[in-house]
Amino acid sequence: MYQEIALVNSEEEPDFTVRKRTLLIKFHSDIDHHNAVQIRMKADRLIERGDLRNVVFDFEEVHFMDSSGIGMIMGRYKQVIFHGGKIAACGVSNEVDRILKISGLYRVMDKFDSAEDAIEAISQRTGGR
């Protein structure tokens, strides 16, 4: 089970949960300049406060992401890699998969079928508990 540490009120805003020193961000809408800054700020607070090592992005409900979303992901990568952590993606739609490939984000993160698979894999690689 996931330990819920923050739940945003709006149905369109992402859920943030923690397991094995990994922050799972489950998106419920597309990621663009309207929401990327808010997501970044919440993720940063949780990563710093919770001494979290990894971040998993669950894109199951995402069909579009602009450059703001790409920047938000790269920023979280830079934040966790400094402490030996990793980022991963799961639930990737064909549309988002194409964006992640074109942007080169797959060079810094792996893709998994489920959040469970992603959390287990990166926790083992980084020693998360």
Task: Locate each region found by the language model.
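Intrinsically disordered or compositionally simple regulatory linkers and C-terminal tails
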Residues: Y2-L7, G128
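STAS-typified acidic loop motif
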Residues: A6-M41, F59
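Long, contiguous secondary-structure blocks with strong helical propensity
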Residues: R21, K86-I87, S123
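Amphipathic alpha-helical interaction surfaces in cytosolic regulatory modules
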Residues: H33-M109
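Residues at or immediately preceding the N-termini of alpha-helices
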Residues: A36, A115-E116
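Short acidic-hydrophobic, aromatic-tinged amphipathic segments that line or gate anion-handling sites
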Residues: D110-S114
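A charged, well-structured terminal subsegment
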Residues: E116-R129
